[in-house]
């Protein structure tokens, strides 16, 4: 079954507001996770390359050793930089890593890009992992992820996937503090980076060529502008690029000319640069 209730898409971090006094120390977090993992079976951590799943994989590798595996799924929707980050950490810290094909591009329901596309993405991910192992699957979802529309969590529940950070009510801020305390310097401050398909407006078919174009433009703007937040959106009206305020101020002249030329070279209409708006490619169905 797939979720039908519409809602606002959670594309990026929406952090639970907690006072400094309410945040647990990294030592307390590691202790709580160690206690949870004492009774855990062998585990397969679904690792996307973001701060949450990378931190969870590091904790599991430290606590469980050979009983923990990291599973990373590749597809046109996964930025190559995320895959390289996972591979590098596995080499550096001795993680047991298996890289698999996500398979969602073979799913017509996913390719149709409905409002609950994430359900079909996670359904394919967890089913592919299950083809390789019978271990308990862990995801890096954190407590902040429960406050919005997350159809991927429905697919996880249907497949008995566990979320240790959710079980221990660990917030995004606590995950980042935990990553810092463990020396995961490349990931501790990573901005939210949803899959590339999130850049495509609901109802527009997901195409690998579109996602490769999105990744190219975003990578170039990060390098050229030092942009902390950049989203290349493909919509019915054309391509618009959303930037953080500082980057937006420097996006004219040669920067705009380059992006416009790349759009024209691939037969795309460039709409322009606009301020970043979370989840703006998501079109929610009307609710009676």
PLM regions and their residue ranges:
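Auxiliary Fe-S-binding modules of radical SAM enzymes
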Residues: 215, 222-224, 230-233, 245-288
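Short, aliphatic-rich beta-strand segments
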Residues: 69, 234-245
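Mid-to-C-terminal catalytic subdomains of enzymes
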Residues: 166-172, 176-231, 275
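Alpha-helix N-cap and loop-to-helix initiation/capping positions
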Residues: 113, 117, 206-209, 250-254
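ATP-dependent adenylation/nucleotidyltransferase module used to activate substrates
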Residues: 3-181, 239, 258-269, 277-288
